[in-house]
């Protein structure tokens, strides 16, 4: 059977930036990497209900700068910035260097694979029918301008005795096109029947010009040009 490579990993340096952007000497690399892992683990646990999409980490001049991309910045910041100050102190303690925390708002959570996967997982935990949750996520993404979306759920769907996988796709999701901007992420729903895995692929268009184009327009990316539909090969 054919296996699917992680869409983010295969596009790193082509159309996808790294989530940790720092350079370290050989003796510091392991401790920095371990620090990044611990910081992310802590923030994801603390901000489990804050709709966090991703966390990017930079390390300028013996300090750490953490950018939290979230759809609900008010929850992260807290009243008069109290919560974000607590997070800053905790991150500085974990990393062992002075910390700075920036908050970036995710304008369209329906087009973010992590937030869509978490939304489907939370619906499954509330006993919403899996087909309804999948279809709703697909419709919302397409309505807000996605070029294509695929959602897959795996596990004891509907409490069935035998685990299985079901998926739903709308539009184009070209996994082999490296210039395609594909957002991919996963989540887990912990139900009374066991764990149900959720995978989401969202195709937002094609990025022409590679990383240089992303650097010039970090937020807005060009939409994919319309192409004629491909044939199905020889019959």
Curated annotation (Swiss-Prot):
One of its GO terms (biological process) is translation. One of its GO terms (molecular function) is structural constituent of ribosome. Pfam families: KH_2, Ribosomal_S3_C. NCBIfam families: rpsC_bact. Disulfide bonds: none annotated. This is Small ribosomal subunit protein uS3. Residues 39-107 form the KH type-2 domain. SUPFAM superfamilies: Prokaryotic type KH domain (KH-domain type II) (SSF54814), Ribosomal protein S3 C-terminal domain (SSF54821). Keywords: Ribonucleoprotein, Ribosomal protein, RNA-binding, rRNA-binding. Binds the lower part of the 30S subunit head. Binds mRNA in the 70S ribosome, positioning it for translation. It comes from Mannheimia succiniciproducens (strain KCTC 0769BP / MBEL55E). PROSITE patterns: KH_TYPE_2, RIBOSOMAL_S3. Belongs to the universal ribosomal protein uS3 family. The keyword Iron does not apply. One of its GO terms (cellular component) is cytosolic small ribosomal subunit. It comes from the Bacteria. Part of the 30S ribosomal subunit. Forms a tight complex with proteins S10 and S14.
């Amino acid at each position: 059977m054919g296996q699917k490579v992680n869409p983010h990993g295969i596009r790193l340096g082509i159309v996808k930036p790294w989530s940790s952007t720092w350079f370290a000497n050989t003796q510091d690399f392991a401790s920095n990497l371990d620090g990044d892992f611990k910081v992310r683990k802590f923030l994801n646990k603390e901000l489990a209900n804050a709709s966090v999409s991703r966390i990017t980490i930079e390390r300028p001049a013996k300090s750490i700068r953490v950018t939290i991309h979230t759809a609900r910045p008010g929850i992260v910041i807290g009243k008069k910035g109290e919560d974000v100050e607590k997070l800053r102190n905790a991150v500085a303690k974990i990393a062992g260097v002075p910390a700075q925390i920036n908050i970036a708002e995710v304008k369209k959570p329906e087009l973010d694979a992590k937030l869509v996967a978490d939304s489907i997982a939370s619906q499954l935990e509330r006993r919403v029918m899996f087909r309804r949750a999948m279809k709703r996520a697909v419709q919302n993404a397409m309505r807000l301008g996605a070029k294509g979306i695929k959602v897959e759920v795996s596990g004891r769907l509907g409490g069935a005795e035998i685990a299985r996988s079901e998926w739903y796709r709308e539009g184009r999701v070209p996994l082999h096109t490296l210039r395609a901007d594909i957002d991919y992420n996963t989540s887990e729903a912990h139900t009374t029947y066991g764990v149900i895995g959720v995978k989401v692929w969202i195709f937002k268009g094609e990025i022409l010009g590679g990383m240089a184009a992303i650097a010039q327009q970090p937020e807005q990316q060009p939409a994919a040009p319309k192409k004629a539909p491909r044939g199905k090969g020889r019959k």
